[in-house]
């Protein structure tokens, strides 16, 4: 019996551990050959072995996804080993948490680089390949699944760098969805909540329970990602899904709210009353994670 992603070639970044590893194994279980990308070569090789033990196909790749050449080589790994590319799952990332007044430039740059540029660079090179395929008359059924976060959608105290990068990923997702649809590419994002090396040292609530359903297991996130990577999901693009445990939710995102139109330029002295009116008519924003 064929799997949901049978023979669909998948690249997963940051796949040596945690959520990325779970994605790689879940795709392999559904028949997909997988490129397991991680800068930790031993971790990537270990996941390849796990995939092969399941009877699947996988190769390891240690490219730095935030490096322009490395990202191009990553896409090349899929094409050279499996002859095609169907799905890109951008997952790689890490944390450098600080309150804003303590956040250093290097900590800002490192997090924005690996998350935001580390999404853009592989996406850019994959998109170039898919555009060429479409122009040659071989329109793909290609899928991109990016990884945003609740921190990117609502903000998270102590994570200004991470929140900004993840918000940027959500913005990149909707733009890429609009631009790449003509080439047969859908682009969506997930905002997962799961236990990883990044989170378990910080959030005690994510610890594995002694019994019962492990709501924070990273494997809970992967079924949605696999479905989004399948041919079945072609009607879904430009969306951000929150996924945690057994819950899947659609994030609503920014929307136009109450407005006042004057028909001419405002005087600054008038705007206090205008803003008060707008705030009274608007719903309260959802709280920033960690805010008192």
What is the meaning of each model-derived region?
Residues 5-6, 54-57, 77-88, 96, ...:
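A glycine-rich helix->loop->beta "capping" turn
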């Amino acid at each position: 019996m064929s799997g949901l992603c049978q023979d669909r070639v998948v690249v997963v970044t940051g796949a040596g551990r945690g959520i990325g590893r779970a994605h790689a194994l879940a795709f392999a279980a559904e028949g997909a050959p997988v490129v397991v990308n991680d800068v930790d070569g031993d971790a990537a090789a270990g996941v390849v072995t796990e995939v092969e033990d399941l009877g699947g196909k996988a190769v390891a790749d240690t490219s730095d996804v935030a490096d322009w050449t490395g990202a191009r080589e990553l896409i090349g790994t899929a094409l050279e080993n499996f002859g095609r590319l169907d799905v890109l799952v951008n997952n790689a990332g890490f944390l450098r948490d600080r309150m804003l007044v303590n956040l250093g430039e290097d900590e800002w740059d490192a997090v924005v680089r690996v998350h935001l540029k580390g999404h853009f660079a592989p996406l850019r090179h994959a998109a170039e390949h898919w555009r060429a395929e479409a122009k040659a008359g071989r329109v793909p059924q290609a899928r991109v699944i990016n990884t945003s976060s609740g921190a990117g959608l609502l903000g998270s105290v102590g994570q200004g760098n991470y929140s900004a990068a993840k918000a940027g990923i959500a913005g990149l997702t909707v733009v890429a969805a609009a631009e790449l649809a003509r080439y047969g590419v859908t682009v969506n994002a997930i905002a997962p909540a799961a236990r990883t090396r990044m989170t378990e040292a910080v959030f005690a609530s994510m610890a594995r329970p002694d019994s019962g359903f492990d709501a924070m297991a990273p494997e809970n996130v992967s079924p949605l990602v696999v479905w989004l990577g399948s041919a079945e999901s072609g009607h879904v693009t430009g969306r951000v899904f929150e996924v945690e445990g057994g819950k899947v939710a659609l994030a609503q995102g920014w929307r136009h709210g109450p407005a006042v139109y004057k028909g001419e330029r405002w005087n600054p002295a008038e705007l206090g009353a205008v803003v008060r009116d707008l705030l009274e008519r608007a719903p309260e924003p959802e709280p920033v994670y960690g805010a008192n």
